[in-house]
From Swiss-Prot:
Species this protein is from: Oryza sativa subsp. japonica
Gene Ontology CC terms, in alphabetical order: nucleus
Domain of life: Eukaryota
Keywords: DNA-binding, Nucleus, Stress response, Transcription, Transcription regulation
The protein's name: NAC domain-containing protein 68
NAC domain segment(s): 21-175
Expression sites (tissue/organ): Expressed in stems, leaf blades and callus. Weakly expressed in developing flowers.
One biological process term in Gene Ontology: regulation of DNA-templated transcription
Function recorded in the entry: Probable transcription factor involved in stress response.
Record-annotated disulphide pairs: none
Subcellular location, record wording: Nucleus
Length: 318
């Protein structure tokens, strides 16, 4: 989830180009510089030293969606954002943001100009939690929030106004500082996968990719190990535990059935067919009508006839 932000978007590169910054420019202001030279000027509607901080309501977005909104930065990003009240007449800010919330950590730090004991700003550290409070999941996104110390935060003249601060200044960064690298690697993998040709196979009118087709073709192959396992299941009782005796597992991948039919090799079926067919017809007629004329002795006599006896002598013993 945290890696969902687009890194180095074209919009941000265009914004950096429009700033006309000198080569090698780095923006790493101190807490005092952020409050005195940027936040105080922003609230007083005075021009900034460099228009390098974007105006974004970061409480409407997840932190991993914010880097692409910034005007400058690779590992840390700066924003001016308004703050709303949690309750209509209260002084606490609403920390819900995107699909989670920001939670304060540590003590507030006063910010004062060098050589002065007068506090001009307050620095607060916050951690983003994904999900609903109080059971959100802690992430690696950190925010330093700077607000003016003497700002008038009384409820505004407009009835029902939720505005707590017109502007506060925020510095955002990821604690592990590796999310940008991971996102770039994911983009490379996705681009390679999109450019790779895909072979398709058809089965029952449905289109499948090559990987699915290979998996399907493997499912129709029976290996020696599969047959051995099936034979072992029979030896140990199989599904019901009743057992089927010992079964010798084949080793060549095929099930061989031994045929004990050598006894009829060389027999002349032309000699066997007439008496067999004659006695079969005789037996059928006798069973249908045992009292029919010409069938004295019935079924017992038919099976003791010379033709049937000859047939019985050539039948194999069971």
């Amino acid at each position: 989830m945290e890696m969902a932000a687009a890194v180095g978007g074209s919009g941000r590169r265009d914004a950096e180009a429009e700033l006309n910054l000198p080569p090698g420019f780095r923006f790493h202001p101190t807490d005092e510089e952020l409050v005195v030279h940027y936040l105080c000027r922003k609230v007083a509607r005075q021009p900034l030293p460099v228009p390098i901080i974007a105006e974004v309501d970061l409480y409407k977005l997840d932190p991993w969606d914010l880097p692409e909104k910034a005007l400058f930065g690779r590992k840390e990003w700066y924003f001016f954002t308004p703050r709303d009240r949690k309750y209509p007449n209260g002084s606490r800010p609403n920390r819900a943001a995107g699909r989670g919330y920001w939670k304060a950590t540590g003590a507030d730090k006063p910010v004062a100009p060098k050589g002065s004991a007068r506090t001009v700003g307050i620095k607060k550290a916050l951690v983003f939690y994904s999900g609903k409070a109080p059971r959100g999941v802690k992430t690696d996104w950190i925010m330093h929030e700077y607000r003016l110390a003497d700002a008038d935060r009384a409820p505004g003249g407009k009835k029902g106004s939720q505005k707590l601060d017109e502007w506060v200044l925020c510095r955002l960064y990821n604690k592990k500082n590796n999310w940008e690298k991971v996102k770039l690697e994911q983009q490379d993998v996705a681009s390679v996968a999109a450019a790779a040709p895909r072979n398709h196979h058809h089965q029952n009118g449905e289109v499948m990719d090559a990987a699915a087709a290979d998996t399907m073709s493997d499912s129709f192959q029976t290996h020696d190990s599969d047959i051995d396992n099936a034979s072992a299941g029979l030896r140990h009782g199989g599904c019901g535990g009743g057992g089927f005796g010992d079964v010798a597992p084949p080793r060549n991948g095929f099930v061989t059935v031994k045929e004990d039919n050598d006894w009829f090799t060389g027999l002349n079926f032309d000699e066997l067919q007439p008496p067999y067919m004659m006695n079969l017809q005789h037996m059928q007629m006798q069973m249908v009508n045992p009292a029919a004329p010409g069938h004295d002795g019935g079924y017992l006599q038919s099976i003791s006839s010379p033709q049937m006896k000859m047939w019985q002598t050539i039948l194999p013993p069971f």
